[in-house]
Amino acid sequence: MTDKQQLADAIAIANIPTLLMVLVQLTGDKRWIADPYRPKRGSGTGDNDSGGFDEAIQKEIRDASLAAILAWKAGEPVALETPSNEELVEMLTSSMGEKVPAEYGEMTNAQLGQTPMKWEDKIDVPEGFNVIVIGAGVSGLATAVSLQGAGVPFKVLERRSNVAGVWQDNRYPGAGVDTPSHLYSFSFAPYDWSAYFALRGELAEYFESVADDFDLKKSIEFETNVISTEYQADTQTWKVKVAHADGSEETLEANVVISCAGIFNPPAFPNIQGLDSFAGESWHTAEWPEGKSLDNKKVIMIGNGATAMQLGPEIQNQVESLTIFQRGPHWVSPFEQFRVDVPEEIRYLFKEVPLYRMWYRMRLGWIYNDRVYDSLHKDPNWEHPERSLNATNDSHRAYFTSYMKKELGDRADDLMDKVLPTFPPFGKRMLMDKSSPKTATSTKLTSSLSQRALTC
């Protein structure tokens, strides 16, 4: 298959609002961000692939995109290679179909210019100066890349035998990310994701690839557990006591200690009376037994947060029964691209046209982060403060309520009161959902645990 045909196949299914941004930069023609080429605002967390255009406009945009990309690949320079902050805000506003604040320009500029990440100048580091980083998970790797790029001597202490942190530990069925893969990754380290929302295995592989690509493992001490850190005021240094896999202990010294240990370890167990004497099998999802089968088991799942959203649907068809105990309900948003593979054509486009990949990621950043910001401000004159913050937030409530009711089906009458939060949408972290409402068999507040069963 020719390069032209591969590009044509990819552009035929590509995201229209993203293609428009590529068109503007490649051609310098700003008619692509004016009517009739302004996408309509997308709903929810969807990618808005069609942009809300009819087939004729979509074809015009796709044809123009193919021509512009082929010209660029043939040597035509990018007409608008470095848009100003103001131009970037204008472009993103058009692409999203809604007003993007002016202050977003600087971040957009940085995001679009960070691949690959380059350090123009090394930091002038005093002789003997060194940094200790605790943890080689997501934060630890990002810190290590930055320190290495700046020329600052450092050492990473990691208690596991490999990098990736929580994505090495969390091995429960269905473990994955509920942020889009192309957003849940470093801007300086793009990746050929196979799924729109990656599962644990691919996430671990990604962070391992970052460590390899930036040659970080030479600076990581694996199977090294930090026991304590103590600041020495007289020398303005830190003493870091560590234990190695062979049982030996050592005290290290550093000018700076950066903790990237994360918040998910060790696992937090609920304070339930009788938990320590429960005679049945029990474990925390963060310590899931490798290869454990739940076939024909009566299972109780305590908690209904993000982990439960992933675990419940994964095991519901294996177990004899599944009962969910919750402290309180959460708002959930549809998770339409969960377990959806990125088409090979789009993976090719991401690889061959960096502008497309970067603008796609930039749009995701707006959709999943700042889009709802204005709707989170409390309206002092709003007539329904008992259920929402303002009119927009109330429309969010109606949408999510309707979604829950639809998913519960004929169980809506008896479960709706139990799964519907009383606080406003986005009052807590939103949970992404594929089919968890359908998984629910009961929702009760856990108060104590007997030797054989939960009691409430």
Where are these regions (language model features)?
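Extreme N-terminal leader/targeting segments of oxidoreductases
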Residues: 1-129, 268-286
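N-terminal glycine-rich dinucleotide-binding loop that anchors FAD/FMN and/or NAD(P) in oxidoreductases
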Residues: 171-196, 201-202, 343-357
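Short beta-strand to alpha-helix junction loop
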Residues: 191-209, 221, 388-396, 423-434
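Glycine/threonine-rich phosphate-binding loop and adjacent beta-strand/alpha-helix elements that clamp
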Residues: 447-456
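N-terminal cofactor/phosphate-binding cores enriched in small/glycine residues
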Residues: 141-165, 172-178, 196-206, 210-212, ...
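Alpha/beta-hydrolase fold catalytic core
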Residues: 105-118, 123-127, 391-442
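Feature captures the FAD/FMN-dependent oxidoreductase FAD-binding
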Residues: 54-104, 195-264, 400
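Rossmann-like dinucleotide-binding core of oxidoreductases
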Residues: 121-128, 133-149, 153-163, 168, ...
